[in-house]
Amino acid sequence: MTTPHLDSAQDIDLSRVHLIGIGGAGMSGVARILLARGKTVTGSDAKDSRTLLPLRAVGATIAVGHAAENLELSGELPTVVVTSFAAIPQDNPELVRAREEGIPVIRRSDLLGELLEGSTQVLIAGTHGKTSTTSMSVVAMQAAGMDPSFAIGGQLNKAGTNAHHGTGEVFIAEADESDASLLRYKPNVAVVTNVEPDHLDFFKTPEAYFQVFDDFAGRITPNGKLVVCLNDPHAAELGERSVRKGIKTVGYGTADAVQAHPEVPAMATIVDSQVVAEGTRATINIDGQEVSVILQIPGDHMVLNGAAALLAGYLVGGDVDKLVEGLSDFSGVRRRFEFHGAIEGGKFNGAAIYDDYAHHPTEVTAVLSAARTRVKAAGKGRVIVAFQPHLYSRTMEFQKEFAEALSLADAAVVLEIYGAREQPVDGVSSEIITDAMTIPVVYEPNFSAVPERIAEIAGPNDIVLTMGAGSVTMLAPEILDQLQNN
């Protein structure tokens, strides 16, 4: 668990900020907030993307490609350079020049920590569900008239943005554990949705991964609260340990989970949930007040995320009824069970195409279970998935679990591994997953052939999901077009 040389974020001058990888989900969000606060923002990214256009429109100067001269995009050198060390190599020419010029280089998490200062900080952490829970919290608090600032890892469908500099006191953000970045923050409210070993390429052992959440809980302000999901064993255990340490801790979850963990005071209990035509109707008791909310996004995991969002909003002064109104209006986040379209007429009539970021077995299980619930409620159709594994290390670590999770679908097409920052590993391909699956599955290493493979498998009223953290998202519109015109 090592990090490259980075400078301390203390006393950093944020008047001119250069962001390497500005098009990324996290970087683009902090760029928006800097611009809204009147800072000079420059940046670079390896390729042009739809993320860069709105940043340029509000004042950012951005170069495509990395070069030493990019540090002078504003006409003078920046006062600080921001990078994500997991994604940006240390020989990046902009990093090299920054160090030659003596310009401080900090992580994106350090910058976010600076932006959070002076706010009532609501930080959402956990192995899964951070983006959805953060987004739900934002929409709920906006409806309650709180106008929070926020920085999330996905684009809110309704707002069309991933960040906002609000007029209210609250700042809501994701707390990323993948490189221990969450230890940069001092939350007033810290939500932990779940804890399950991941990012072992960085942490090396599950124990080290678990420890970072304990350390995060220890950074909560004296009058703050830790909020844990009691349906998740490791999050519940974190809550119990925190209670014993004297950290103010509350829990949320279904009634049976609340009963199973009496040591953690429950402040949000899911009394009941059921699938209805509009989505999922849930009855939730928030600190003695029973409310009913309809969630448009399916799945038991989304009900838990919704309960967490309501509780977070309540703990920072939001009116429960108004928070519920906002949550009922939540239409999702880009790449989280995102609807791309449905087929009208022809042999695939009624088939619907969705895209999801799920890239861990637990996330895959949750999304496919939600899709299966929707198919069951409709009384027709099947669940078809096109899955692209993400990272060789994760594929090796969880090959058995991926096979089991994907087998919740009725049929699957599995693409080759998206390596991202990792180099290929001898003997490791997606076939170590497909060989263990128990449903009809096609291993398709040819990316461009996937829409055709799906057309050979899909039928009317099916839910077709593209799934993964890599380039598979590009296939959703292509599959829609293939089925519509087949």
UniProtKB/Swiss-Prot annotation:
GO terms for molecular function: ATP binding; UDP-N-acetylmuramate-L-alanine ligase activity. GO terms for cellular component: cytoplasm. Its main location: cytoplasm. Its EC number is 6.3.2.8. Pathway: Cell wall biogenesis; peptidoglycan biosynthesis. It catalyses: UDP-N-acetyl-alpha-D-muramate + L-alanine + ATP = UDP-N-acetyl-alpha-D-muramoyl-L-alanine + ADP + phosphate + H(+). InterPro entries: Mur-like_cat_sf, Mur_ligase_C, Mur_ligase_C_dom_sf, Mur_ligase_cen, Mur_ligase_N, MurCDEF_pg_biosynth, UDP-N-AcMur_Ala_ligase_MurC. ATP binds at G126, T127, H128, G129, K130, T131, S132. The keyword Acetylation does not apply. It is found in: Cytoplasm. Keywords: ATP-binding, Cell cycle, Cell division, Cell shape, Cell wall biogenesis/degradation, Cytoplasm, Ligase, Nucleotide-binding, Peptidoglycan synthesis. The keyword Transmembrane does not apply. Pfam families: Mur_ligase (PF01225), Mur_ligase_C (PF02875), Mur_ligase_M (PF08245). GO terms for biological process: cell division; cell wall organization; peptidoglycan biosynthetic process; regulation of cell shape. PANTHER family: UDP-N-ACETYLMURAMATE--L-ALANINE LIGASE (PTHR43445:SF3), UDP-N-ACETYLMURAMATE--L-ALANINE LIGASE-RELATED (PTHR43445). Belongs to the MurCDEF family. Cell wall formation. This is UDP-N-acetylmuramate--L-alanine ligase. It comes from Corynebacterium glutamicum (strain R). The gene is murC.
